[in-house]
């Protein structure tokens, strides 16, 4: 009986210690403040439709993203690749083939000051993208914390995941577009 009574007292003490305030305590006040500032500055500019296209000899890539004010996201990706081969001593390209990551998708987005790696010293402005393909594939279209650079009335710039420019960034342009290929 004494053990049972002692256990009840310990459990009640733990419950009272965990619930001593109705106000939640922020774990990282600096990250919270920077996240709020990031959203005040850029979230309204993010809302809308953006597109990015990159065409090279061996690949063609198009992506369109629509960011909604409620934190939802819809998008489309078209990606094709081909190989350079030598036939009878002549270099040629194979036919274009669709990459499996092509398709339409939907999900969520948010801006946050954080460290995707979980280390305080690597915190930065991030664009968090979580999206599944509309045809219910086993893999996701996005599950990524991209380093966010900026958004303006005309340009949205963040670190590329699948395809990127020479500097490691992708610069989406505002507006609706269709792939040129």
Residue ranges: model-predicted function:
Residues 168-181:
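Short, low-complexity, Pro/Ser/Thr/Gly-rich segments in the mature regions of secreted, periplasmic
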Residues 2-10:
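Sec-dependent signal peptide recognition
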Residues 69-73, 154:
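Structural signal for glycine-centered tight turns and loop->strand junctions in beta-sheet-rich domains
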Residues 21:
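Short, conserved catalytic or interaction motifs in soluble domains
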Residues 55-60, 78-157, 164:
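Contiguous, well-ordered beta-strand patches that form the walls/edges
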Residues 15-18:
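C-terminal motif of bacterial Sec signal peptides marking the signal peptidase cleavage site
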Residues 29-51, 66:
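N-terminal helix-cap/turn-to-beta initiation motif at the start of protein domains
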